[in-house]
Amino acid sequence: MVKVVKIWKGDLMMRSKSLAKNKDLQRKVLCSLLAAGVMSVCISGGDVWASGTIKDQDMIITSNMDIVADDGEFEGVTNRYAAIGHTQDSTMTVTAKPGVMVDSVVTATNGRAMGIVNVGNGVLNVNGNYSFALNADTVRGIRNNGYNDLNLNGDFIIKAVSKGKNSNNDVVVGVEAFNGTNITVNGDKLNIDITTDNARIIGVQNFNNNGETITFNSNDTSIKAVQIGTGSVCQGVLAYQSTTNFNGNVVIDLKADQV
């Protein structure tokens, strides 16, 4: 038996108006949440989430995410942009679930681009698989500064491009620790790829970090740096009064006028 349902024109118009009102309300709520920084935006049919800088908050990432850095307020200035950053005296944890990829783009004009930065006196844990595309005159792939710990667990791919022309002021660093900090990297892969016109290149910098340690436990660690111009310095590992440990397979490949 076939059941026939009749919808009168008036009912259809009322339902259409009701749906329109609901969509308008949802749109207003979404805009309010975005303005308040409460949530990110889902694009591409729900497969990829877009976010600004993840800063001073715990987060569990359950779907692929694209981060476009929009916060440059780190270390007392306003032109040091980062994809993931921590500035507090507390513990912050960002976890991307298994199978999830987080891609980040950080661009700074007349400033610094950083992938991950921890500059408070707390602990920053970043777990999962991440890639960072950094572009600025001065670049830091991973930076830890100021009596704290930075723990990375997963696969990390860092591609840094610097247009810096002044080797005295423009510096590109893959991983660095300063002022009483420890960095531990665990996982299958750490891949750092640096290209610059004429900035100074440092693959790993463990400087002014008396008694502290950077430990690379990744199964495969690759640090590649290419300087296109001439007259600058390219250094693989720079350490002073500190310890840098490499466990696993390590490749450090430097190409520059002075190595």
Language-model-detected regions and their locations in the chain:
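Surface-exposed loop/turn motifs in large extracellular/passenger domains
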Residues: 49-259
